[in-house]
């Protein structure tokens, strides 16, 4: 029994020795797979960038025919818009407008683009920026977390550039409404300049372009290729001109006629009655008008209570200005003396 047990043990040891020798031989030829090393903080990213650079360098080396590799990167996610007002109108839908060819909007003049659904409205404000009235409109829009299109007058923009910057900073679209709010079917009129009404002769195209350049200067950044004719008087040759400039033309579906009203409740009643009749539409208001500024909050409250939804129209690309008009505006707003220095380097608050 003992001899048999000893023999079995020796056999097991012999087999183990044989298999161990085979294993050692194999590992000495191929070697074990290396364990992945943990990168120190920052090393992993640097390595990935380096590898990408080497691949790109190899692909774009002189004499190679292979095209460079383009790596698509996801755009940063937009920060969600929060509204502290649970009863705010908000923005139900945002639409992007390709202004190529100068499309027209507003069924009072244009019938091509019926994109609004029942109960949807677009808020638009003309003739600003103007002290007190425009800030009241902006405050109401902000309280309701909603957006609008503004069509400022170029001359007003040069008076209140800081105010127009606030409009743009609020996320609203900023179009234009000529330089001095003239009837573009004519070439003579009157313009309120420096607090005085003066006889005024003009070229209609100059009126359009000076207004665009003035608004762009006042905002200090991109503005929308959106235009509205004063008094909605739209000569065909200027419609064609704006089409070549790729600027969309805005008429209206619902004119509030707030410029005829002195009381905020009249403006509200006008808008709500017309919406009840039409059910949807582009609404024309004026942030220049006191009654509209004073009643803006109540009007938005009424729109919310009635279940209307705001659609925000934003441009696919910004408007382009014409250099000669930009230069003319700069001469007008800066005067004959300008050293080119920013105001912050000339005027500094040292006590307050």
What are the residue ranges of the model-derived segments?
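Hydrophobic alpha-helical membrane-insertion segments, chiefly the h-region
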Residues: 12-24
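Short glycine- and acidic-rich boundary segments immediately preceding or forming the N-terminal edge
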Residues: 58-99
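Alpha-helical scaffold elements lining the catalytic groove of polysaccharide deacetylases
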Residues: 133, 182-219, 233-279, 292-294, ...
């Amino acid at each position: 029994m003992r001899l048999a047990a000893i023999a079995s043990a020796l056999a097991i040891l012999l087999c183990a020795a044989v298999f161990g020798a085979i294993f050692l031989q194999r590992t000495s030829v191929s070697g074990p797979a290396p364990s992945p090393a943990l990168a120190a903080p920052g090393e992993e990213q640097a390595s990935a960038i380096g590898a990408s650079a080497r691949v790109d360098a190899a692909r774009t080396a002189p004499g190679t025919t292979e095209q460079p590799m383009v790596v698509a990167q996801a755009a940063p996610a937009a920060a969600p818009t929060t509204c502290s007002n649970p009863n705010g109108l908000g923005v139900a839908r945002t639409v992007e407008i390709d202004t190529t060819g100068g499309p027209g909007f507003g069924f009072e003049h244009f019938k091509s683009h019926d994109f609004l659904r029942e109960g949807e409205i677009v808020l638009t404000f003309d003739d600003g920026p103007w002290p007190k009235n425009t800030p009241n409109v902006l405050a109401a829009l902000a309280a309701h977390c909603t957006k609008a299109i503004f069509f400022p007058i170029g001359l007003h923009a040069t008076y209140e550039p800081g105010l127009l910057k606030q409009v743009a900073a609020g996320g609203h679209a900023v179009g234009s409404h000529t330089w001095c709010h003239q009837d573009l079917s004519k070439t003579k009129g009157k313009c309120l300049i420096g607090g005085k009404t003066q006889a005024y002769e003009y070229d209609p195209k100059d009126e359009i372009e000076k207004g665009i350049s003035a608004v762009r200067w006042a905002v200090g950044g991109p503005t929308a290729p959106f235009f509205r004719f004063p008094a909605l008087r739209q000569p065909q040759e200027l419609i064609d001109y704006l089409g070549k400039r790729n600027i969309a033309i805005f008429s209206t579906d619902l004119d509030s006629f707030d410029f005829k009203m002195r009381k905020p409740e009249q403006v509200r009643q006008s808008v709500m009655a017309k919406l009840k009749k039409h059910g949807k539409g582009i609404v024309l208001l004026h942030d220049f008008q006191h009654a509209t500024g004073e009643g803006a909050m109540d009007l938005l409250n009424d729109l919310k209570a009635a279940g209307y939804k705001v659609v925000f129209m934003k441009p696919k690309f910004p408007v382009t200005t014409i250099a000669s008009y930009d230069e003319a505006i700069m001469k007008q707003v800066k005067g004959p003396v300008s050293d080119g220095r920013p105001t912050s380097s000339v005027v500094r608050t040292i006590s307050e």
